[in-house]
Amino acid sequence: MNNSEQLRAIEFENIELTTIIQRLENGQYAIPVFQRDFVWDKSNIRDLWDSIYRHYPIGSFLIWETDEQLPRHRNILNIELKENSKGKFNYVLDGQQRITSIIGAVKGAKRNRTSFKLFFNISKAYEMSKKDLLDQISNSPFLTEKELKDSSSSDQVLPLEKLLDFDSAIYRNLSQINYDLSDYYLTISEKFRKDYKVSV
C-alpha cells in the first residue's frame, strides 16, 4: 500500500461505550467547531439509552484521524474535555448528537438549567425482563431527573453512571434488599460496560 492509499484507508473497530466516553474525556476524540450545535432534548437522550439497553443498533460513528489540528469544542454540555496536543487528532464527523448524549447522560451534564442526567429503574427493568416482548417495548426503564422527582415509586433507581462504573457498594446494598435485583444489576452493568459495542 503506498502513502496516498494509507491516507485514504478506511478502518473500523468495535468499542465499548465506556471507551468512547474515556476517549472524549482524555482528548483522544474531539468535536470540531464546524459541527452543528447540540440539539437533542431529554427524550431523544432517553430513547438513545433505551435502544442501547435493548441492544438495538444506534449506528456507527465516523471518526476522522489526521495530523492537522483543527479548532474544537473544549467542553460538551459544560463538561470540560482535555486537549490532545500531540500526535494524531481524531475528530467526530458523524455521530456528534449521539456521542454528546452518551457522555451528557452519564456525567449528569447541565445546560441552561436543563439536566441531562438519566436514571435507570432497575426494579422496572427486572420486571420487564419477565414479560413478553410487546410489554417490554412499550415501557422504558430510564427516567429523567424530573420524572424521578415526580415519581412516587419505591423502585430501586440508580444514576446511569453507576451502571457503567460498577460500584460494589451499590451491589452490596441491592443484595441486602433483593437478591434477584442484585443479580440482575450485575447482568445489566456488564451489558452496558462490555457487551454493547459501537463501530467507529
Which residue ranges define each predicted feature?
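Basic- and aromatic-enriched surface patches that contact anionic nucleotides/nucleic acids
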Residues: 2-39, 46-200
